[in-house]
Curated annotation (Swiss-Prot):
GO terms for cellular component: mitochondrial inner membrane. PANTHER family: SOLUTE CARRIER FAMILY 25. Disulfide bonds: none annotated. InterPro entries: Mit_carrier (IPR002067), Mitochondrial_sb/sol_carrier (IPR018108), Mt_carrier_dom_sf (IPR023395). It is a multi-pass membrane protein. The chain crosses the membrane at residues 22-42, 85-105, 130-147, 199-219, 237-257, 297-317. This is Mitochondrial carrier protein CoAc1.
Amino acid sequence: MSSSQESTFTSASAAAQVNASALDLLPVYAKELIAGGAAGAFAKTAVAPLERVKILLQTRTEGFQSLGILQSLRKLWQYEGIRGFYKGNGASVLRIVPYAALHYMTYEQYRCWILNNSASSIGTGPVVDLLAGSAAGGTAVLCTYPLDLARTKLAYQVSNVGQTGNALGNSGQQQTYNGIKDVFKTVYKEGGARSLYRGVGPTLIGILPYAGLKFYIYEDLKSQVPDDYKDSVILKLSCGALAGLFGQTLTYPLDVVRRQMQVQSKQSQNSSDGFRIRGTFQGLLLIIRCQGWRQLFAGLSLNYVKVVPSVAIGFTTYDMMKALLGVPPRERVHASGGNK
């Protein structure tokens, strides 16, 4: 029996060594992709109910226009049950995994490139994080935007479960979608591949400063922390949360324009009521004129509630996954150059 236990232990040890050696063979950028994807999935799922309510408020969905956060959550529970909290989350996670993976990985890559090629002219301070974060945000958005469009259209639908009649929040003209694939097929039929990127303008205009500011503020705040507390998870989370809150406040109106552009159907664009968003700045002015300036900040308080845990979970998971996968410290990566 002893020999059997020893054999089992030896086999387990050998398997662990094989797994460890396999991880060692992965390039650093692949490990950063894995860590970033895991961070995005955990963070997005944790705040999915709040994200659903935020979209309903941003798009002025009928029945939710005058409700607060708790009232909206209760209404979703009443008509759709717990599944209503996560409607569109499949598309959201499907988008956020490649988005977060690309965002974190390209941020590290852009940062390394800037330091290796432009450090003499722009220095090595937080401005590097501003530039790298902005470039990474734009790259990730362009690669994953159709999935964000699908997520928004699915979350915009509110079903009146168990009752007849139109779905809550959707007029008779609104298209009903049965999943991510159905969204892609329907939107593509409406206007081709270009329709899959409806609203990408305000998204890019918003993400470039937001992503840059988030990394800039996060790294700048971390640099102010005394050396004895540099490894404190709580302080890292606090820095990340503050960075996220500040960046969100500055760029939130652009997010509202993006959401309203995304839920516009071909029918609504051809309507005679005059409300049709054609571009970012025209959309800002149109919303102010027709819906009031407060609509540009609809759901912002909810976003504050959402951003704090989302950023906290995202940064924490990313750091934990990097440690688990054996990603070397940033300074070592830059020094070696070739690892990247």
